[in-house]
């Protein structure tokens, strides 16, 4: 079996899935206290880096995704599959788990 080299450009989500680069979590509190890694909360904001072709409707047509590459999004806390690539954190989730586009 050949080894597969994964990178952001080689991951192509299927259906209505979205590949998101997770934003960095806060290093310190508003009061200036540094947080250890174990105390950091999982961020729920990230940037869309890849989008699938969309959900397939009952008639076979595709429903275009509402989000696009480059959108900053807020997503459900426990949604998706966490993936690490090249030291960065990503999450692969379905479009329905995206709560909002953040401007």
Swiss-Prot record:
Q: Which PROSITE patterns does this UniProt record tie to the protein?
A: CHAPERONINS_CPN10 (PS00681)
Q: Which Gene3D superfamilies match?
A: GroES chaperonin
Q: Which SMART domains match?
A: Cpn10
| Cross-referenced InterPro entries | Chaperonin_GroES, Chaperonin_GroES_sf, Chaprnonin_Cpn10_CS, GroES-like_sf
**GO terms for MF:** ATP binding; metal ion binding; protein folding chaperone; protein-folding chaperone binding; unfolded protein binding
HAMAP family tied to this protein: CH10
According to UniProt, the name of this protein is Co-chaperonin GroES
Q: What is the native source organism of this protein?
A: Parasynechococcus marenigrum (strain WH8102)
